[in-house]
Each structure stands twice: as C-alpha cells, then as structure tokens.
Curated annotation (Swiss-Prot):
It comes from Sarcophaga peregrina (Flesh fly). It is found in: Secreted. Residues 1-22 form the signal peptide. Belongs to the attacin/sarcotoxin-2 family. This is Sarcotoxin II-1. Pfam families: Attacin_C, Attacin_N.
Length: 265
C-alpha cells in the first residue's frame, strides 16, 4: 500500500512538472509609474515706470509636458501700463533637452484685442546650448518695419555650492534699423543668486557711437508657501548712462512678482 502511495505521488509530481513545462508561468511585466501631470504656472508682476503709471505683466506657462529627456516649452503672455496705451501680447513655443534648446516667440502690440486676427509684429527665435558649467546661445529679433537684431552670448558658472551661485555672461548684439541707423551692443553681466530666493545682478553695456550704460538689480523672496506652489518676490533695479549724449541720465524701477504653480490634470 505504501509503495502504491509513493508511486502515485511520483506520478503526480511528474504530471505537474509536465504541465509547468507545457504552460510556463509568465512573470508580470512591471508597469512604470505615471509621469508627473502637466502643471500650469501663472506669473503676475507690477513695476513702476519712470514715464508714468505701472507696468503690469501676466504670463501663463505649462511645465511637465514631456519626460526626463525632452521638455516642450509653451507659454502665453501680455504686458501693458495702467495709464493705457499699447498692449503687448504673445506666445512662445519650443523644446529643450540634453543640454539643447530652441524656441520661437511671436508678439503683437495693439490698442485692442482683435480676436483671432493674430498678426505678429515682433518675431524672436533662439537656439541655446547649456552644459553643466558653460552655455551659449544665438537669437534673432525681427521688429517688423523697425529693426532686426542678431545676438550672440556665452555664459559660465563662476561659483556654485549648496547656497550660493554666481554666473557671468558676455554678449554682442548687431542692431540694424530700417531708418539706416545701425549699431552694436557689447557687454557683460554678473548674476548672483541664493538658495533662499534672493538675487543680485550688475552689468555694463557699450552702445557703439552712443555711449556706455550701467545696470544693477536685485530681488528678494518675501513669501513662499510650504509646498512651494505660491511665492511673492520684490524686485528693484536701476540704470545710468556713463557717457555719450545721455550721460548721467538715470532710470529706476521697483515691483512685485507673484507666481502660482497650479495643479496638473
């Protein structure tokens, strides 16, 4: 009897082995977690204008549209002054990834909304290369009926740690105006930022045949929510002509900037 039970058990094991060989089990294919949903970022800023009124700007951009390798760029914006006058509105589209980026911006200035009649007056295109410490870009701005500007720039990270960051940028712009007055702009800028959201910048620009202009600016984070979705910044800046026909002329501005990162879909 015991031999019969042992024989039956052996036959059962062999049968199960045959079934397993004939119908092998497939391991479940791991499903990657879903990527972060797109996030809408709304930015509003108000700044003083030396000619009167307050300059107001609104920009809506979308982030997390791509993946870890490629990120599309999409934003719309509008700028105006509280005293009235022209309103600038436009849109930017582009793509960036692997240290490369390209974008195109179309804008229009008019005194009223024309609905779907979107005829750009200013067209901008940019091609940028960004590495860990060095970067370069070329851009072209065509202001229809006014000017054509071609700009080349190189940037470098001078210093960086967990709290402090210092970048340096040099550039040259060739400006051709439709009225025949052409000139070059060459200059440089230092840009410092702190991990807490504070920053300072200073630059010097030479306008060929005109003179030199110095610029300084700063910003400070006044408020930031615990989740980082809402922040309020104060900024201030000024410029002064150091030489040329505009020598000693100054311009100042102060403002506030509110940024909100909305929820994804």
């Amino acid at each position: 009897m015991k031999s019969f039970v042992l024989f039956a058990a052996c036959m059962a094991i062999i049968a199960l082995g045959s079934l397993a060989h004939a119908y092998p089990q497939k391991l479940p294919v791991p499903i990657p977690p879903p990527s972060n949903p797109p996030v809408a970022v709304l930015q509003n800023s108000v700044a003083t204008n030396s000619k009167g009124g307050q300059d107001v700007s609104v920009k809506l951009s979308a982030t997390n549209l791509g993946n870890n390798h490629v990120q599309p760029i999409a934003e719309v914006f509008a700028e105006g002054n509280t005293k009235g006058g022209n309103v600038l509105r436009g849109a930017t589209v582009g793509v960036q990834g692997h240290g490369l980026g390209a974008s195109v911006t179309k804008t229009q200035t008019d005194t009223k909304i024309k609905g779907l009649d979107f005829q750009p007056q200013l067209s901008s295109s940019t091609l940028a290369l960004q590495g860990d410490r060095l970067g370069a870009s070329i851009s072209r701005d065509v202001n229809r009926g006014v000017s054509d500007t071609f700009t080349k720039s190189v940037s470098a990270n001078v210093f960086r740690n967990d709290n402090h960051n210092l970048d340096a940028t040099v550039f040259r712009s060739d400006v051709r105006q439709n009225n025949g007055f052409n000139f070059q702009k060459t200059g440089g800028m230092l840009d410092y930022s702190h991990a807490n959201g504070h920053g300072l910048n200073a630059g010097l620009t030479h306008f060929s045949g005109i003179g030199n202009q110095a610029n300084v600016g700063g910003s400070s984070t006044l408020f930031k929510s615990n989740d980082g979705s809402l922040s309020l910044k104060a900024n201030a800046g000024g410029s002064q002509w150091l030489s040329g026909p505009f020598s000693n002329q100054r311009d100042y501005n102060v403002g506030l900037s509110l940024t909100h990162h909305g929820c994804g879909g």
